[in-house]
Amino acid sequence: DDTDMERSTEEHQKNILDNLRWLGLDWDEGVDVGGEHGDYKQSSRFERYREVAHQLVEKNFAYEDDGAIRFKVPKDETINFKDFVRGDMTFDSSDVEDFVILRSDNSPTYHLASTVDDVDYGITIIARGEDILSSTPKHILIMEALGADLPNFCHLPLLFGPDGKKLSKRHGDTSVEAFRDKGILNDAMFNYLCLLGWSPGDDVEHFDREFAISKFDFNKVLPNSAIFDEKKLLWLNGQY
């Protein structure tokens, strides 16, 4: 996701990938390992997004509006999908306004770029924060207009600080690098992050990646916001 040309830099991208690898995560396709879908950068796919936007206009699913293109939301319809964490979800299309998919400068919005990527890449599970939940009906409408099969959805709870407010700069530097510099081990950080909103059961708290992979189930993730407790992280780090 590098459509914001001012904020998206090679250094920023490298930092994200380095942090993921430090946590012990890897992937089969991506910007640094390649794959069958090009370089996996949205900035390289602008022509594809424009092509899809104009296809939607031709099929009367979208229309031009002052240089931009808006998706035409059908009225009085229900949009249903099953969420692994939140169960059956239903939205009334009348509560969703026509939304921009291509800006007047020909750049795609998040709704268009992410949805087209999910369709083109054959994504089967979309796991993201619950703050994106309200966007999901829009993405489903685009997918249906494109005649694509719907993936499974999973909207994960956000992380909150001990004060009950969403984790942010007010809670200090909570970046992966900051904890790494404090001496937090990657195994401990991975272990602790797994416990935020999920548990393998039987009061087990200390486990490795292989154990987490064997036990993890999206359906067992709690919908309630998880509290990031640095004291608990430090305790767990001591176990390693």
Regions found by a protein language model. Give the residues of each.
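Short linear loop/turn motifs
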Residues: 32-38, 68-72, 157, 204-211
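A generic structural motif
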Residues: 2-4, 120, 240
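N-terminal Rossmann-like or analogous alpha/beta NTP/dinucleotide-binding catalytic cores
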Residues: 1-68, 93-94, 135-148, 188
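Catalytic adenosine-cofactor/nucleotide-binding cores of aminoacyl-tRNA synthetases and other
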Residues: 6, 147-152, 156-240
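Active-site cores that bind ATP or allylic diphosphates and position pyrophosphate for catalysis
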Residues: 42, 55-169, 175, 200
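Catalytic cores of large soluble enzymes that bind and process phosphate-bearing ligands
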Residues: 8, 41-48, 73, 131, ...
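Internal, well-ordered alpha-helical segments in soluble enzyme and binding-protein domains
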Residues: 49-52, 67, 108, 135, ...
